């Protein structure tokens, strides 16, 4: 999720502003608007994790993150910037964090706290390492090339990490056990309006 976090995207603030000729305020307005829109979209896309197998959903998130990174490398207007920030905030900060915590909560019955701590430790480590690493890359490459490198890293590395980390978890049996029971019992999910009214 680090690629969609503010600490990471902020590293590209200056080069993008200079190239597009926009002010700090204009960049901030675009960033805030795109972030709000992504959070609203997350409400709908996020709940879809209950409708699909976790492995398929994870690959969807990876593809979206890959496309977001690629789009960043082609920014040439404020419209492209808004779209790139929207997709990156949605796929990175939103869906990546959502998918990881949901997966652990669903499939880790023992040591769930340790597993959750491990993923947040990863984010803290990224907050320390990535700013230094990206600043170093700026000396060698353009910011567009850096984003292209990130896109390649995402599409090549993340699928391998997912497959290697979940190979010992029986995802299919767990998900097959849950879905038929719900269908047999004809359990109806509450709609958002009903939840709000009940509150």
PLM features: residue spans?
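Conserved MFS/SLC helix-loop-helix module at the cytosolic interface between two early adjacent transmembrane helices
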Residues: 40-78
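Helix-loop-helix hairpin linking two adjacent transmembrane segments in secondary transporters
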Residues: 119, 123-170
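Intracellular juxtamembrane helix-capping segments at the cytosolic ends
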Residues: 94-108
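Hydrophobic core of transmembrane alpha-helices in multi-pass small-molecule transporters
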Residues: 79-95
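Juxtamembrane cytosolic amphipathic helices that cap and anchor the N-termini
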Residues: 77, 191-199
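Short hydrophobic/small-residue motifs within alpha-helical transmembrane segments
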Residues: 33-36, 124-125
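Extracytoplasmic
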Residues: 1-24, 42-45, 130-131
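Flexible cytoplasmic inter-helical loops of multi-pass small-molecule transporters
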Residues: 166-189
């Amino acid at each position: 999720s680090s690629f969609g976090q503010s600490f990471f995207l902020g590293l590209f603030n200056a080069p993008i502003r200079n190239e597009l000729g926009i002010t700090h305020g204009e960049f901030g307005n675009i960033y805030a608007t795109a972030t709000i829109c992504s959070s609203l979209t997350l409400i709908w896309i996020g709940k879809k994790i209950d409708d699909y197998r976790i492995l398929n959903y994870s690959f969807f998130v990876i593809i979206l993150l890959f496309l977001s990174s690629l789009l960043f490398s082609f920014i040439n207007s404020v419209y492209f910037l808004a779209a790139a920030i929207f997709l990156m905030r949605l796929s990175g900060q939103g869906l990546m964090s959502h998918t990881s915590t949901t997966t652990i909560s669903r499939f880790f019955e023992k040591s769930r706290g340790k597993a959750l701590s491990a993923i947040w430790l990863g984010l803290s480590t990224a907050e320390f390492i990535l700013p230094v690493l990206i600043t170093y890359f700026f000396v060698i490459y353009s910011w567009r090339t850096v984003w292209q490198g990130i896109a390649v890293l995402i599409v090549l590395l993340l699928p391998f990490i997912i497959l290697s980390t979940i190979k010992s978890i029986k995802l299919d049996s767990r998900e097959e056990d849950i879905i038929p029971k719900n269908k047999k019992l004809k359990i109806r999910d509450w709609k958002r309006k009903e939840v709000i009214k009940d509150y």
